[in-house]
Curated annotation (Swiss-Prot):
This is Glycerol-3-phosphate dehydrogenase [NAD(P)+]. Gene3D superfamilies: N-(1-d-carboxylethyl)-l-norvaline Dehydrogenase, domain 2, NAD(P)-binding Rossmann-like Domain. It comes from Listeria monocytogenes serovar 1/2a (strain ATCC BAA-679 / EGD-e). The active site is at residue 194. It catalyses: sn-glycerol 3-phosphate + NAD(+) = dihydroxyacetone phosphate + NADH + H(+); sn-glycerol 3-phosphate + NADP(+) = dihydroxyacetone phosphate + NADPH + H(+). Belongs to the NAD-dependent glycerol-3-phosphate dehydrogenase family.
Length: 338
C-alpha cells in the first residue's frame, strides 16, 4: 500500500490511538496538539502518558503544535477533539486548508446551543470547496484497547461510499476491522446519545443495582435513541449495528468508559462538579444530556430515561427517587413504530 500522510487534530487518547493504527499500516500520521508537554513527549519519548499510560508509540507517529505543518500534504484530516471545541477548531481548519481534503471526525456529541450533530457543525464552519468528503468514524471502541491492538470493529459512514472506502482502506488491519455505511445521521445519533445511557448505567451500578436493572436501562435506552434518530432522518436499522447497539454495549459495561465512571460516582452520592473535577477529562454525556433534553421536548419525543438522567445531572434529583419514578410509570406495550 502506498504510504499516505494523515493529519490527526487532537492529541488525546483517541487521536493518539488512531495515529498508532495508521503507523502500523505504514502510513504517516501527524498529530496536531496544543500542549508543548504532550507534543514533546510524543516526539521524544514515543509515549502519551496522560492519555494512554504504558503504551509505546511507533516512532513513525509524530506530533506538532503547528496546524499548517500537520495538514500540509495530508490526504485525510481526522478531527479527534471534544465536541465543545469542534466549532473553534473547524474555524481554524477552514483558514488553514488550501485544497479539498477528506475530513473524518470521531467526536461523539451534540452541540447544546443548536442541537447540531458534529458533521453539521463541520459543514457550517468549513467551506464546501475544501471538503472533498466528510466521514464519521464510529463504533464500539475504547482507545486504550485499540492502542493495545485488541480486536476492534468500527464503521466509516459517509453519503459518498467511495470516500468511506478510502478511510476503510487506510485504517483496516488484522486488529481493526472497518465496515462502511451511508447513514451519517444514524452513526452520529447513536454515538452521541449512548453516552447519556452510559451515565445511567454507571449511576445504576453506583446505586448497587444489578445486571437486571442495567439490561433494562440499556434496552429501553436504545429504544429512546432510535426514536429520536428516526425522527431526524436515521435508518432504524443503523441502531442495530456497530454505531448503535454495539457502541451502547461497550460504553455501558466497561470501566474504560468515562461516562460510565462518571455515572458510577454520581450513583455513589458525589455531585456533578466533584465528579467532573476528579475525571480530569471530558465527559461527553453530560453535555449531550443537556442538548437532548431540549431537543426531545422540541420534537415531542418520549425519552423518560434521558429526562431522568438530565434531572439527576442538572436538577439535583435524587438518583434512587429517579429510578422509582421510572419504575412507577404507566404500563405500556413494548412496541415501536418506525
Amino acid at each position: 500500500m502506498t504510504q499516505k500522510k494523515v493529519a490527526i487534530l487532537g492529541a488525546g487518547s483517541w487521536g493518539t490511538g488512531l495515529a498508532l493504527v495508521l503507523a502500523d499500516n505504514n502510513h504517516k500520521p501527524v498529530i496536531w496538539g496544543n500542549l508543548d508537554k504532550i507534543v514533546n513527549e510524543i516526539n521524544e519519548s514515543h509515549t502519551n502518558s496522560h492519555y494512554l499510560p504504558d503504551i509505546i508509540l511507533p516512532t513513525e507517529v509524530k506530533a506538532t503544535l503547528s496546524l499548517d505543518e500537520a495538514i500540509d500534504g495530508a490526504e485525510i484530516v481526522v478531527i479527534a477533539i471534544p465536541t465543545n471545541a469542534m466549532r473553534i477548531v473547524c474555524k481554524q481548519l477552514n483558514e488553514a486548508l488550501k485544497e479539498p481534503t477528506i475530513l473524518v471526525h470521531v467526536s461523539k456529541g451534540i452541540e447544546p446551543e443548536t442541537n447540531l450533530r458534529m458533521s453539521e457543525v463541520i459543514e457550517e464552519e468549513i467551506d464546501a470547496a475544501k471538503r472533498k468528503a466528510l466521514v464519521v468514524l464510529s463504533g464500539p471502541s475504547h482507545a486504550e484497547e485499540v492502542a493495545l491492538r485488541h480486536p476492534t470493529t468500527l464503521c466509516a459512514s459517509c453519503k459518498d461510499l467511495s470516500a468511506a472506502e478510502i478511510v476503510q482502506d487506510r485504517f483496516i488491519n488484522n486488529n481493526l476491522r472497518i465496515y462502511t455505511n451511508d447513514d451519517v445521521i444514524g452513526a452520529e445519533i447513536g454515538g452521541a446519545l449512548k453516552n447519556i445511557i452510559a451515565l445511567g448505567a454507571g449511576i445504576s451500578d453506583g446505586l448497587g443495582y444489578g445486571d437486571n436493572a442495567k439490561a433494562a436501562l440499556m434496552t429501553r435506552g436504545m429504544a429512546e435513541i432510535t426514536r429520536l434518530g428516526v425522527a431526524v432522518g436515521s435508518n432504524p436499522q443503523t441502531f442495530y449495528g456497530l454505531t448503535g447497539i454495539g457502541d451502547l454495549i461497550v460504553t455501558c459495561t466497561s470501566v474504560h468508559s468515562r461516562n460510565w465512571r462518571a455515572g458510577n460516582m454520581l450513583g455513589k452520592g458525589e455531585n456533578l462538579d466533584e465528579v467532573l473535577e476528579k475525571m480530569g477529562m471530558v465527559v461527553e454525556g453530560v453535555r449531550t444530556a443537556k442538548a437532548v433534553h431540549g431537543w426531545a421536548k422540541k420534537l415531542d419525543i418520549d425519552m423518560p430515561i434521558t429526562e431522568s438522567i438530565y434531572a439527576i445531572l442538572f436538577e439535583n434529583k435524587d438518583a434512587r427517587e429517579a429510578v422509582d419514578l421510572l419504575m412507577g410509570r404507566e404500563k405500556k406495550i413494548e412496541k415501536e413504530s418506525f
